[in-house]
Amino acid sequence: MSPTTQAWSINNTVVKENYYTEILSCITTFNTLNFLIVIISVVGMAGNATVLWLLGFHMHRNAFSVYVLNLAGADFLYLCAQTVYSLECVLQFDNSYFYFLLTILMFNYLAGFCMIAAISTERCLSVTWPIWYHCQRPRHTSATVCALFWAFSLLLSLLLGQGCGFLFSKFDYSFCRYCNFIATAFLIVIFMVLFVSSLALLAKIICGSHRIPVTRFYVTIALTVLVFIFFGLPIGICVFLLPWIHMMLSSFFYEMVTLLSCVNSCANPIIYFFVGSIRHHRLQRQTLKLLLQRAMQDTPEEEGGERGPSQKSEDLEVVRCSS
């Protein structure tokens, strides 16, 4: 064997070893991220199931808790689908429903996005026009809005699944782009509503002569919105917006934003119970139901942790409406 041939053989062997080492490293990273996604999703499913159980069967529902209930439902279904999807990727068993799971993920992501925007917008309306809100707002507005958001999210995800070949048809480039454009425009509109309403609510709290007192419910809303922006929004940008600018991202990046989206869905129940436990009496029994009620408490507290006596806004509005 000539020196040139021997050198080429050695170099070729080194290249192959480096290639297989790199592939093995990628597979290990991919599987590790998917296992983390599964663990976070299981924890999140337990938390959201607890919220669903308490709000659905053990607590009196109001205009805002209806949105929280639907948000917990969207997060629970999203985490369920993501768990199955990640296990299919790692274990590589029957993937006949692989693309169907993508449609379910899009459906619940869109629904959850809408619920967060609805919570912020409704709260903004209640403090900006309190008399109209308490006197003229239809009684079943929250349930109606949630039903419309679920229906529109389902329709949009089915159109995307059908046009992009996720369901029962072949990939149609033109129709897929058209549906993706509608979904992207819808997400931008919902995000602008969320952004403007959150800023208006923040301005009402910290600015002006008629500043509203900070309650636990405002803290809950603020943390929920912030967590969604930092953890839940990136996957929406990657899936719906980046294809329009023809930006190709690595599979590792997509796994990371998927992990962040699971953290977002898992974090909401933790936020509720954390806010409910702030300044809690140590001698008082801390049940999950009580913590959830306190997280949605809309009256400020005095130093002792009790509700402020001056906050009877809802009662005053009822009297004003009836007079």
UniProtKB/Swiss-Prot annotation:
GO molecular function list: G protein-coupled receptor activity
Sugar-bearing residue positions: 11
One Pfam match: 7tm_1
Main localization (coarse): membrane
Region forming the signal peptide: none
Family matches, as Gene3D superfamilies: Rhodopsin 7-helix transmembrane proteins
Protein name, entry field: Mas-related G-protein coupled receptor member B4
Recorded name of the encoding gene: Mrgprb4
